[in-house]
C-alpha cells in the first residue's frame, strides 16, 4: 500500500452529467490505496469559507452516484477569486483565503474538475500558493484543447439528438420548419454531432458562415422533392447575417448567448412564408443520467488523476485520446481552444449526407 495521503476534490464551473462518476472513481481508487478523500463544497468557495466547507467521502456514500447528473459537491461559475465581487459592488482579491483553506486542511493534493476557465484559475492558485493540482476536463462544449472528449459532452449530444428525434415527428405532422437551438458557447461541437445523429437538414455552427438565401433554397428544394418539413439545429453563438452575436440579458444585467433561433425563424417566415417553430434546449443539456460514454471516461479520468498524485506528477491534466487516457500539462491544454475545424471529418460527413452546413 502506498504512503497515506489526504486529497481534496472539487467541481467548478457549470454543471454537467458525469461529474459524480468522476468523484466516485476518485474515492474508489484512493480508498484502495488507503488514502482519505475530502469533497470541497461549491468549488473554491468551500476553501474560502471559515472553517472550510468540506466532508470526508466514503465509498458507500458515492457508490449510488454513478449515473446521477449534477454534482454532489455543488459548484459555481461565478466569482473569480482574483477579482471577487463584493456586496458593495467592488472587487477584491480573495485568492489568499482559498490557498489558506487548502493548507488549513493539510491536503497533499487537489483534484480540480472544470472547463478551461476553471482550470486556468485553479492553476493560477496552485502556482501562487504551492497547491499540488491535478486537473480533469469537463464541459458540454467539448472545447478544451488536446482532449477528444470532456466529461458531459456525450450526454449533452444524446439529449440534443433525442430532441431532434422528437421534433422530427411534429415537423412532419404539421409541415413545419423546426429549429433547435443548442448550447456550446463559441464551439459548434454539440450542434454538429447531434445534427448528424438526429437527422437534421441544416446544421449551423459558429465556425462556418452561412447564407439565409441558401437556407431558404434548401428548404424550398426539399418541398419540391415532396418533403414538407425541415429540421434545423443551430449553435447558440452563431451570428446573424449582419455579423451580430445575439445575447439575452437578465434583470441583473448579466448577458448570455441566446436568440439566434428566433432570428432564423423570423428570417425564414418572412422570406418564404414557411411555418416555423423554435425550441431552445437550454439547461436540459446539462442534466439527467450520464451516458455510458461519459461514465466510462469519467471513471478512467478519476483513476488516472489519483495515479498522477501517487506519482507526484502535478500541474497536469488527464485527457482522452484514441480511447485511452493520456496526461498533458494543464498550461498546454487550456492554451489550445478547440473549435470545430471546417475540414473536420464530421463536417465532411454532414456535407456528404446532403446537410446544409454553410459556405
UniProtKB/Swiss-Prot annotation:
Catalytic activity: beta-D-fructose 6-phosphate + ATP = beta-D-fructose 1,6-bisphosphate + ADP + H(+)
Pathways involved: Carbohydrate degradation; glycolysis; D-glyceraldehyde 3-phosphate and glycerone phosphate from D-glucose: step 3/4
Biological-process GO terms, alphabetical: canonical glycolysis; fructose 1,6-bisphosphate metabolic process; fructose 6-phosphate metabolic process
Signal peptide span: none
EC number(s) stated in the UniProt entry for this protein: 2.7.1.11
Cofactor(s) for this UniProt protein: Mg(2+)
Highest taxon of source: Bacteria
Site location (Important for substrate specificity): 117
Subunit relationships: Homodimer or homotetramer.
Name of this protein: ATP-dependent 6-phosphofructokinase 1
Protein source organism: Nostoc sp. (strain PCC 7120 / SAG 25.82 / UTEX 2576)
Amino acid at each position: 500500500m502506498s504512503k497515506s495521503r489526504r486529497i481534496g476534490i472539487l467541481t467548478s464551473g457549470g454543471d454537467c452529467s458525469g461529474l459524480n462518476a468522476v468523484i466516485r472513481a476518485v474515492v474508489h481508487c484512493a480508498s484502495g490505496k488507503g488514502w482519505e478523500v475530502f469533497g470541497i463544497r461549491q468549488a473554491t468557495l468551500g476553501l474560502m469559507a471559515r472553517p472550510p466547507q468540506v466532508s470526508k467521502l466514503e465509498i458507500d456514500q458515492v457508490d449510488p452516484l454513478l449515473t446521477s447528473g449534477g454534482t454532489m459537491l455543488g459548484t459555481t461559475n461565478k466569482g473569480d477569486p482574483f477579482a471577487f465581487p463584493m456586496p458593495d459592488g467592488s472587487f477584491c482579491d480573495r485568492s489568499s483565503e482559498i490557498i489558506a483553506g487548502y493548507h488549513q486542511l493539510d491536503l497533499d493534493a487537489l483534484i480540480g474538475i472544470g472547463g478551461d476557465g476553471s482550470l486556468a484559475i485553479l492553476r493560477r492558485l496552485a502556482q501562487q500558493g504551492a497547491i499540488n493540482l491535478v486537473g480533469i476536463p469537463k464541459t458540454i462544449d467539448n472545447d478544451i484543447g488536446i482532449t477528444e472528449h470532456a466529461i458531459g459532452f456525450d450526454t449533452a449530444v444524446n439529449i440534443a439528438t433525442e430532441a431532434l428525434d422528437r421534433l422530427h415527428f411534429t415537423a412532419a405532422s404539421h409541415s413545419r420548419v423546426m429549429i433547435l437551438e443548442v448550447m456550446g458557447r463559441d464551439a459548434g461541437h454539440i450542434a454538429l454531432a447531434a445534427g448528424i445523429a438526429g437527422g437534421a437538414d441544416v446544421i449551423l455552427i459558429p465556425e462556418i458562415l452561412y447564407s439565409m438565401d441558401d437556407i431558404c433554397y434548401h428548404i424550398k428544394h426539399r418541398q419540391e422533392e415532396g418533403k414538407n418539413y425541415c429540421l434545423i439545429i443551430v449553435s447558440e453563438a452563431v451570428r446573424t447575417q449582419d455579423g451580430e452575436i445575439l445575447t439575452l440579458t437578465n434583470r441583473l444585467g448579466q448577458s448570455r448567448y441566446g436568440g439566434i433561433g428566433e432570428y432564423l425563424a423570423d428570417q425564414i417566415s418572412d422570406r418564404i412564408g414557411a411555418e416555423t417553430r423554435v425550441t431552445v434546449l437550454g439547461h436540459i443539456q446539462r442534466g439527467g443520467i450520464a451516458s455510458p460514454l461519459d461514465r466510462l471516461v469519467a471513471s478512467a479520468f478519476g483513476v488516472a488523476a489519483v495515479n498522477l498524485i501517487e506519482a507526484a506528477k502535478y500541474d497536469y491534466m488527464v485527457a482522452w485520446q484514441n480511447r485511452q487516457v493520456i496526461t498533458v500539462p494543464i498550461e498546454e491544454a487550456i492554451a489550445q481552444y478547440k473549435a470545430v475545424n471546417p475540414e473536420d471529418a464530421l463536417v465532411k460527413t454532414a456535407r456528404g449526407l446532403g446537410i446544409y452546413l454553410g459556405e
